[in-house]
Amino acid sequence: MNKQPRAFTSAILELFSEEITTRSGTLIDTIQDDTRLFARSVMPGVREVQPGDKLQGGVALRATESEVWLHPYVFRQVCRNGAIMAHALRSQHLTDLDLQDFWDFESVLREAIQACCADEVFATSVREFRSATEVQADLALNLLSLLSRSGLQNTSGLLGQIMDQFFREPAQTRFGLTNAVTAVARDTRDPDTRWRLEELGGAIAASIKPTPPSLNPGMKKARRQFVSIA
């Protein structure tokens, strides 16, 4: 049973790093405080979303003293933006970990990391990104509504930053909007806001609309659902 949150998230990070490096991957970003851990990694394989525009697949991890979220991750090399594909079938949300000993769920955590690293998972993400390059972004979808659904604070300020970035993009496609959102995420200092923006970027690329996360910390399972925004 977990009694020390930072020791717990440190153990999670060590296991995550081990699984990633075993697969010749690299941890590219880690943020840890007394109660939270955010980590992102990339695998060595590269695919092009457009000529000369390369993507790498990987895994994004978020952990608290009682929960772990694992999602496929897409990293765009040219601008060093990342998108979290929280809608992916291989995403995992492990709960009630503070009521268990670490070794009781270690194998489940390793399997979840391995699943997110699978080649077919990255291939699916690349198809979603390529499709996004061919679809004009309909701003009537109401980006402010999407931001609100993502559970983000200061949505009006974020909206202004995203729109400024979007109109600098060479094409006003769904891919361009994804890049605008993830560019703002990249430059955001708050790790939770950055995570949620990267989730939103992944959702836009895949043409889905996230519902807000549950505000009830006692919920046993994530209540996130997705509907098409195509």
Model-assigned labels for residue ranges:
Residues 26-47:
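Beta-rich nucleic-acid/ligand-interaction surfaces
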Residues 2-26:
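Amphipathic alpha-helical segments
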Residues 12, 35-37, 55:
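Residues at beta-strand starts and edge strands
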Residues 46-230:
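Intrinsically disordered, low-complexity regions enriched in serine/threonine
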